[in-house]
Amino acid sequence: MIYDNHLPDSATNVQVFHAQGEATDWYSWNKPHNCKFVHIFCLGGGGGGGSGSGAATGLARRGGGGGGSSGFTTGFFSAAFLPDTIYLQVGKGGAGGSGGSSNSNGSAGTLSYVSISPTASVAQNILIQSGAAAAGGGAAGGALGGGGAAGTIWAASATNILITGLIVPVVGQVGGTGQTNPTPNNITIAGLTTGGAPGAGLGSLGQQGGSILGTGSVPTVIGGPAGGSSTNTTPGGDGSSYYTTYPSSTNYVAKNLFFSGGSGGGSSDGGSAGNGGAAAFGAGGGGGGCGFTGLGGRGGRGGNGLIIITCF
């Protein structure tokens, strides 16, 4: 038997805030009347995937690294300890590295903040933030294709207002390192967000891009298919975009929150490479595959941050 005496009533108020405009823009949130408890979920932006390299047929090449995923922080507070208005800045995801002949790194994401004033420069005013360091972008295949760094956990000073609540910081996940060998370098799910999978490398034959391996109710985000050989200019396929359980039409989900990165682009020895897949909120973009001279795939964009405030 289930007793519902202590379950929250229908007055629960959920508000969701997305990145918009400039990365330095702030929202304001006003505490509803009769609110007793406040839960805050604060997720930063994920890193963009690196672009894949390009070279003449038969030469070994490396795919771009996947972007890292952001850390996140949750906070649970008695509403009486919070001011009537708090301010929110939602981080943006990093751009993927440009494809073609540019062979560039992905950009880092940016942090998300919840503060008692519209500034992130006064540490004592910050209620919670998504992490200490933002998720890093994946390196280009021509720069060894390293995976983007994971967003680190936030360790706040005891002088912060956060001491009035229960705070749980969680680290992100490193992006996958760009491939050179035929076996795809896949991402294993380890938490709420994932890094991006890397782009495919090659010696003389096109290869499949890295995937994000599914588990339980989460499906696999499949890497882009392999392209052709030196005598076949079939392009590598683009990596798949993200899988997520959120948002829904009601801002609620039937499953736990989950945000995947993008998968890696496929490679082609004689043609253009596949692009990395785009990421869900806070996750890393997929790395671009490698291709013929000047035809490396671009990296996928990192997912924007997200702040969810629940009041009851």
Task: Briefly describe each language-model feature range.
Residues 129-137:
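A short, sequence-level motif marking secondary-structure junctions
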Residues 87, 126-129, 279-280:
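Structural motif
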Residues 1, 5, 138-139, 194, ...:
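Viral virion structural and adsorption modules
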Residues 1-34, 39, 78, 160-166, ...:
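Enriched but not universal
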Residues 1, 39-41, 259, 279-284:
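Short hydrophobic/aromatic-rich beta-strand motifs
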